[in-house]
Amino acid sequence: MEIESAATSGESFTSVTSKKSRKRRAAEERPMDMGEQPSKRPDFPPISGDKLMGDKDEMRKIPVPSHRYTPLKENWMKIFTPIVEHLQLQVRFNLKSRNVEIKTCKETTDVGALTKAADFVRAFILGFQVEDALALVRLDDLFLESFEVTDVKPLKGDHLSRAIGRIAGKGGKTKFTIENVTKTRIVLADSKIHIMGSFQNIKMARTAICNLILGSPPSKVYGNIRAVASRAADRF
């Protein structure tokens, strides 16, 4: 037999190593040089505020209607202080164009500071108290929404006046109730309605106001918004 003759002759099988195993063994035997190996993740150093804002200074202009000149003058320091000290922006009231002008500078570090300041001033111009409008600077999830009574229902004359009266209530009771339950702030300026709050809260307040405009009695509206508010509280 051939197999028996090969075994008796003392011949043995030769092991063959593949190219991959040879390369792997050579890589393991080679000393590790940590300095030459590139890092797996790119390392980007933080950008300074002035580079992030760019070379050009940005500016926002907020027009001021004539009936808000006096309140703006009386509350100027309350508006000026948080914009300059907290947001590191420049602000002035242009007497010629009747605009509040807000501008970035070298000290400005926050990219969204200009938008926050513009929303803060715009909220005050719309009729919100300075203390309430200041929440737009401190918190990120607050928004402004404006609409007119005629957007919900085309009313005129006495019908429009009655709809506005239903929203306000006797001595402002209805408006205050909606504000407290939905945790929003509401301003009634003639037929315009301005709401400030978080997205969900604005939605609840808007639904309640629309129901009042469409003719729902206040007691029914109170019950609906309280039920929605309690469901939202349970959800979170």
Curated annotation (Swiss-Prot):
Main localisation: nucleus
Compositionally biased residues, Basic and acidic residues: 26-43, 52-61
Source species, domain of life: Eukaryota
Pfam families according to UniProt: KH_KRR1_1st (PF17903), KH_PNO1_2nd (PF22891)
Compositionally biased spans, kind Polar residues: 1-17
Keyword set includes RNA-binding: yes
Stored CDD domains: KH-I_PNO1_rpt1, KH-I_PNO1_rpt2
Keyword Nucleus: yes
Subcellular location: Nucleus, Nucleolus
One GO cellular component term: small-subunit processome
Chain positions covered by the region annotation Disordered: 1-65
Assigned keywords, A-Z: Nucleus, RNA-binding
GO molecular function annotations of the record: RNA binding
Purpose of the protein: Part of the small subunit (SSU) processome, first precursor of the small eukaryotic ribosomal subunit. During the assembly of the SSU processome in the nucleolus, many ribosome biogenesis factors, an RNA chaperone and ribosomal proteins associate with the nascent pre-rRNA and work in concert to generate RNA folding, modifications, rearrangements and cleavage as well as targeted degradation of pre-ribosomal RNA by the RNA exosome. Positively regulates dimethylation of two adjacent adenosines in the loop of a conserved hairpin near the 3'-end of 18S rRNA.
Homology family: Belongs to the PNO1 family.
SUBUNIT field: Part of the small subunit (SSU) processome, composed of more than 70 proteins and the RNA chaperone small nucleolar RNA (snoRNA) U3.
Protein name in UniProt: RNA-binding protein PNO1
Lineage of the organism: Eukaryota, Metazoa, Chordata, Craniata, Vertebrata
Gene name, Swiss-Prot/TrEMBL: pno1
